[in-house]
Amino acid sequence: MTLTLGHFLSLGAMLFALSVIGIFLNRKNLIVLLMAIELMLLAVNTNFVAFSYYLGDMHGQIFVFFILTVAAAESAIGLAILVLLFRNKSSINVDELNTLKG
């Protein structure tokens, strides 16, 4: 059995749908929201790599590295906000984010 472009695109679509479901079902926990956003970026990266491979173009794979860099910065900032929220409120509830002043 060979893996075709459709297999990779369906995998990307399933990962993307799973992350959207995770965002809509759990809007309270900041860690779950960050993980769902990272899963969404992983789905997009999977599609970029699949198209890049099957079209024989390296631009998609290069663009994935830029997306990974932005995702790492996003995760670092999100976890820093999470640590600040937990220190101040002893909770990681998203509803308490509006109480942070700085």
UniProtKB/Swiss-Prot annotation:
Main localization (coarse): membrane
Membrane topology: Multi-pass membrane protein
GO cellular component, one term: NADH dehydrogenase complex
A molecular function GO annotation: quinone binding
InterPro entries for the chain: NADH_UbQ_OxRdtase_chain4L/K, NUOK/Mnh_C1-like
Keyword terms: Cell inner membrane, Cell membrane, Membrane, NAD, Quinone, Translocase, Transmembrane, Transmembrane helix, Transport, Ubiquinone
Localization per record: Cell inner membrane
Enzyme class: translocase
EC number: 7.1.1.-
A Pfam short name: Oxidored_q2
Catalytic activity annotation: a quinone + NADH + 5 H(+)(in) = a quinol + NAD(+) + 4 H(+)(out)
Keyword Cell membrane among UniProt keywords: yes
Record-annotated membrane-spanning stretches: 5-25, 31-51, 62-82
Entry's family note: Belongs to the complex I subunit 4L family.
Alphabetical list of HAMAP family matching this protein: NDH1_NuoK
Biological role: NDH-1 shuttles electrons from NADH, via FMN and iron-sulfur (Fe-S) centers, to quinones in the respiratory chain. The immediate electron acceptor for the enzyme in this species is believed to be ubiquinone. Couples the redox reaction to proton translocation (for every two electrons transferred, four hydrogen ions are translocated across the cytoplasmic membrane), and thus conserves the redox energy in a proton gradient.
Oligomeric and partner information: NDH-1 is composed of 14 different subunits. Subunits NuoA, H, J, K, L, M, N constitute the membrane sector of the complex.
NCBIfam families with a match to the protein in the record: PRK05715.1-2, PRK05715.1-3, PRK05715.1-5
Xref: PANTHER family: NADH DEHYDROGENASE SUBUNIT 4L-RELATED, NADH-UBIQUINONE OXIDOREDUCTASE SUBUNIT ND4L
Record's protein name: NADH-quinone oxidoreductase subunit K
